[in-house]
Amino acid sequence: MKVLLGLLLGYSVLILTHELPDLSATQHPPKEELAYWCTYVKNCDFCWDCQNDICKNKITNESISINSIVNCRVTRDSIHQWCFYEISVKMPNHHNMECSLPRPYTGNEIFMEKWGGGDYWPIIIRHCCFYLVFSIAFVGYIVFAYHKNLHLNTTMKLLALLSILIWLSQPGLNRPLSIFYMKQNLPRTYTPPVRELEYWCTYGKHCHFCWECRHGICKNKVWDDMPFIKQNDYISQCSIARYFDRCMYFIKPKTPYIHYMDCSQPTAYEGFSHS
């Protein structure tokens, strides 16, 4: 471990003091950079030496099953000091890292390549048209109030009424989980609202927020027919988000990935592959 930390520290100093050349997309990084690249995602194929279905890590000497190894490519942009992993399991995903340290790059922890293309443009156009009409109505109301010399109290009441109508129209624009759920977007969070657990846990039965664990034994909060499991088995850290009519899982086992779903029901979102 001390040797590994020393290598990482030395390589970090090397990167900080010497601008490394661009590294075009390649299956295997240079051997002298393995200690750096293999720190963040240890299950990349170039970090392991496999014989007889048993793989030994080239840096830490750990051993794992060959089934845990995934194919990876690496890239470096020396101008912006960004280093990239491209990991392909069932669905490719990308990791951005600061080249100076093997950790996720701030603001770009993970992003997905979109398949199908352009399928959410009708939603964006619908929103733009709606807010354009709202803006015209708002300006028209201000002009109307000015010419009619309406009292400030009356003006504020009518503005409040207009705002309420706009708020109530959001479910029609965003197709939420149900007609009773009025929130437009669900920001990325690690725990969904309790009332939505059944929805989110239909697909992500392995997400940690679907389980209640005591003394190392976990019971599913939603599905009574799910057998008890050990706390360290099967459960993964998950976070969720809702964007327009699209719902997303951010699942982080050894290799993070995103799963897209229709917000109306927990089924795969058309046009996106999922793991």
UniProtKB/Swiss-Prot annotation:
<feature type="transmembrane region" description="Helical">
    <location>
        <begin position="127"/>
        <end position="147"/>
    </location>
</feature>
<feature type="transmembrane region" description="Helical">
    <location>
        <begin position="149"/>
        <end position="169"/>
    </location>
</feature>
<comment type="similarity">
    <text>Belongs to the asfivirus MGF 110 family.</text>
</comment>
<keyword id="KW-0812">Transmembrane</keyword>
<dbReference type="InterPro" id="IPR004848">
    <property type="entry name" value="ASFV_fam_110"/>
</dbReference>
<comment type="function">
    <text>Plays a role in virus cell tropism, and may be required for efficient virus replication in macrophages.</text>
</comment>
<keyword id="KW-0325">Glycoprotein</keyword>
<protein>
    <recommendedName>
        <fullName>Protein MGF 110-11L</fullName>
    </recommendedName>
</protein>
<keyword id="KW-1043">Host membrane</keyword>
<feature type="glycosylation site" description="N-linked (GlcNAc...) asparagine; by host">
    <location>
        <position position="61"/>
    </location>
</feature>
<dbReference type="GO" id="GO:0016020">
    <property type="term" value="C:membrane"/>
</dbReference>
<dbReference type="Pfam" id="PF01639">
    <property type="entry name" value="v110"/>
</dbReference>
<keyword id="KW-1133">Transmembrane helix</keyword>
<dbReference type="GO" id="GO:0033644">
    <property type="term" value="C:host cell membrane"/>
</dbReference>
<feature type="transmembrane region" description="Helical">
    <location>
        <begin position="5"/>
        <end position="25"/>
    </location>
</feature>
<keyword id="KW-0472">Membrane</keyword>
